[in-house]
């Protein structure tokens, strides 16, 4: 059997840069900030150390999360004016004591965004979430340590 080796730092760095390009495509400011942070982290830990494999693994996992789980919302053009009008109505309602918070305004503003979902985004269905964990049983024994609470049937 061949032992699996951790990728080298250059491979992890390139993988992270590719992930930022995919996740933040079209948003130059965020893309630049993410790449600058990646470079800063790699430069700070340039010398080999005991924790180098752990840091490389962290970079690979971060890249995977960026690539598969980060979705950006783009404000829909023309929605800004409607959102401003809606916000001013809420301010008036709050002044009259009809409305207490800003949650409704935030929800309305968030609804006026278009999500940029690309082909790498991990997709799931709600059915798998609803049925998750229904077939598993856990026995709790009274008087035992926490590490001994689970047992298989």
Curated annotation (Swiss-Prot):
One of its GO terms (biological process) is mitochondrial respiratory chain complex III assembly. PANTHER family: COMPLEX III ASSEMBLY FACTOR LYRM7. Assembly factor required for Rieske Fe-S protein RIP1 incorporation into the cytochrome b-c1 (CIII) complex. Functions as a chaperone, binding to this subunit within the mitochondrial matrix and stabilizing it prior to its translocation and insertion into the late CIII dimeric intermediate within the mitochondrial inner membrane. Modulates the mitochondrial matrix zinc pool. It is found in: Mitochondrion matrix. Belongs to the complex I LYR family. MZM1 subfamily. This is Mitochondrial zinc maintenance protein 1, mitochondrial. The lineage of its organism: Eukaryota, Fungi, Dikarya, Ascomycota, Pezizomycotina. One of its GO terms (molecular function) is protein folding chaperone. Keywords: Chaperone, Mitochondrion, Transit peptide. CDD domains: Complex1_LYR_LYRM7 (cd20267). GO terms for cellular component: mitochondrial matrix. Interacts with RIP1. InterPro entries: Complex1_LYR_LYRM7 (IPR045298), MZM1/LYRM7 (IPR050435). It comes from Ajellomyces capsulatus (strain G186AR / H82 / ATCC MYA-2454 / RMSCC 2432) (Darling's disease fungus).
